[in-house]
Amino acid sequence: MRLCSVLAALLLISFSAHALVSPQSQSLSHGASRLEIVLEKKDKESWQAVDPGKVFLQNDLLRFRVTANFSGYLYVLNHGTSGDYTLLFPRAETGQENRIEANRSTNVPATEGSFRISGPAGHEVVYWLVSPVELSSEKIQSEYIPLPPPPKERKTPPKLIPRCDDKIFRARGDCIDMSAGPQGVADDSLPDNLAAIPAVSSRELLFERGQSASVVSAAEASGKPVIFEFRISHR
């Protein structure tokens, strides 16, 4: 996947989204933490919400719209089908301000840019992370470390061929890959820079998906980061 008009090869990254209890973020101790992700595709001059499992084509332009019921700092990293790891957000081309405010939508990229589908067919693996403190800040609590750069070693993800769900295709004519979208991630499959961050187990997260939005939630605030992945299926 390419960052339209800026990067030669930009891959989506997996990021963990989570509310941590700290003076710099809203406490969720009185309610469940909830993160809604809307995947949007550019259609001519407008953006349209699409099914998270939609199978995209080469050169399709995408972006995410994120809304949480908590405040924190958002980090997004991509493991592309070519094997490269790339930090998608924050960075100069996609927006340096990565603080998200409770109940306020944030676009990724936060600039006027977009992500362009490219590379071998398969699944882009996007990792999400929301921290109560800025990971590059000197004020980080002792148990947290600045987010290291993505691994330089190319590691081609398992080959997953995009497949249309026959029932959905017959019902509404859309090619939807039910293995795409948000899901938990095993600790041993995380890139090194994310594996070093103590996080809530994916088993403690709930994943819901609809035709135009996905929701990742936790029943209780745990005081730890949460890491999950969002798979983008394309031909």
Q: Where do the model's predicted regions map?
A:
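Bacterial N-terminal signal peptides
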Residues: 6-15
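Secretory-pathway glycoprotein ectodomains that are cysteine- and/or Ser/Thr/Pro-rich
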Residues: 17-73, 77-235
